[in-house]
């Protein structure tokens, strides 16, 4: 009846509501959320009630806090810089970084496929699929992609970091 921790398995700003309600009712245990809340609106809606919350997230969320030895840091920072140049400082979206990563993966695969077949042909589509499934060590903003015919996600442990919300900010937890 008095758990040590609560996992709110939600996404987006609505995931702040159960946590705010538990705080109002006096729950003082730990809070965990999912990567689905890794956006500035969650922080805005949750306010101080979401401080001290832990969540796993893509490394891009805390790119500037990653150790320089982290292989994703450079690409994640490049995404953040490009996104914020277009949309303003502090506007970065982890969700947009998934699209960025997809672009990097398809660019690498298309570069390989075009060497084997003419674009627009069935042969090219087959080569593109083969190249996608042969993707190795493509560094994105969320992780490093290594795909196969059986793994179309291609991400491993390097694709997530633990983050804590501290005073309304995302803080990397090594």
Name every feature range the model reports, one short phrase each.
Residues 1-174:
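Extracytosolic ligand-binding ectodomains
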